[in-house]
């Protein structure tokens, strides 16, 4: 593989190529539409012959996430991927990883629900991802790409954040980004870490018999309530550190805007076109795109919203991120929602029409 390579490929394929180039140690997954190209591309790349990366098709999503627990617990850079109903099956394992402070990467290429739903794209997993879909008080770092390039770029970023904070991280994509094809600049190759580097960089990891160190026990269990409370408070302190340091977002034409669209992922691409159409009609509109859905850029959005006439939250769901937007602005300006469901991607003209009807 070239150090840097420009290719035309699907978002799912970009995830696979970026995983190999990011020095990932192992991928454990199970095919499900619309993300099956991730494991298919990894099988075609055969990285076990070049970098030594393990690629394993597990028997289920439940098995996949528990393999992630084991791999991450040994200090390895490991990942899995699935789509909405498959990620729902992983929630217990994600909670266990958060409780045991085990790093790992989960890629969710969303499809419509609830239940089996449809194979068409959706953003209906926002609550599940940002609120912690398993039991207990925990959070997952959530990055929302809106291009094939970001699909590739976020693999290494998410994994680095996972290890920096010893916490699961998620790339929350959708079927549009996963299946669309764009030009992408693949990142340079990063070698996998040696066993010595793993032991040095991850002193907490369970690495077997390690000279000069007591064995590490990886667990989320603590039966003494007073110690479990201490553990939970330590987790919350870590989450506050993440909130203070890892917020990411993007703005477009917001300085002179009277109204602002708030959207993430593929919906933000459509909203960007809606900004163009609205401005052609003389309506000054901008776009605020959260890149980290957790931590949500609440302070940055609240600051931007000052002096605006209203915010229109555009999503491919019944209204989920809109709750975080309303919490951020605390009733200081009107907030409306426009969403399509069932796998339908909104049209830019619909968004402009919704702005006129709901906020003007």
Q: What spans do the regions from the language model cover?
A:
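Structural signature of the thiamine diphosphate
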Residues: 140-197, 350-360
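Peripheral docking tails and interdomain loops at the edges
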Residues: 315-360
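Conformationally flexible catalytic loops at phosphate/diphosphate-handling active centers
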Residues: 166-251
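N-terminal glycine-rich anion-binding loops that anchor highly charged ligand groups
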Residues: 7-44
């Amino acid at each position: 593989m070239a150090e840097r390579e420009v290719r035309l490929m699907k978002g799912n394929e970009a995830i696979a190529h970026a995983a190999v180039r990011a020095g990932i140690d192992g991928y454990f997954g199970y095919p499900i539409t619309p993300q099956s190209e991730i494991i298919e591309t990894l099988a075609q790349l055969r990285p076990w012959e070049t970098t030594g990366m393990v690629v394993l098709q597990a028997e289920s999503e439940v098995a996949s996430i528990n393999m992630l627990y084991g791999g991450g617990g040994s200090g390895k850079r490991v990942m899995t991927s699935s789509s909405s109903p498959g990620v729902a099956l992983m929630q217990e394992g994600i909670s266990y990883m958060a409780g045991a402070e085990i790093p790992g990467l989960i890629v969710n290429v969303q499809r419509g629900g609830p239940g089996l739903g449809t194979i068409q794209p959706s953003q209906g997993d926002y609550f599940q991802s940002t609120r912690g879909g398993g039991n207990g008080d925990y959070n997952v770092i959530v990055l929302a790409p809106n291009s094939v390039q970001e699909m590739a770029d976020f693999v290494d970023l998410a994994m680095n954040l996972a290890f920096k904070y010893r916490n699961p991280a998620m790339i929350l994509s959708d079927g549009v980004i996963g299946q669309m094809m764009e030009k992408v600049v693949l990142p340079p190759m990063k070698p996998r870490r040696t066993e010595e580097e793993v032991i040095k960089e991850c002193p907490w990891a369970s690495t077997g018999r390690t000279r000069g160190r007591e064995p590490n026990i990886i667990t989320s269990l603590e039966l003494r309530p007073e110690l479990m409370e201490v553990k939970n408070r330590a987790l919350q302190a870590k989450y506050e550190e993440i909130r203070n340091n890892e917020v990411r977002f993007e703005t477009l034409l917001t300085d002179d805007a009277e109204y602002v669209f708030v959207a993430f992922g593929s919906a933000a691409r459509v909203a960007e076109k809606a900004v163009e159409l609205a401005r052609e009609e003389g309506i000054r509109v901008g776009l605020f795109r959260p890149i980290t859905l957790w931590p949500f850029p609440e302070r940055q959005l609240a600051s931007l919203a000052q002096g605006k006439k209203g915010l229109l939250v555009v999503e491919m769901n019944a209204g989920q991120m809109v709750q975080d937007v309303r919490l951020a602005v605390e009733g200081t300006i009107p907030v409306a929602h426009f969403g399509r469901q069932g796998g339908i991607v909104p049209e830019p003209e619909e968004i402009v029409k919704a702005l006129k009807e709901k906020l003007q």
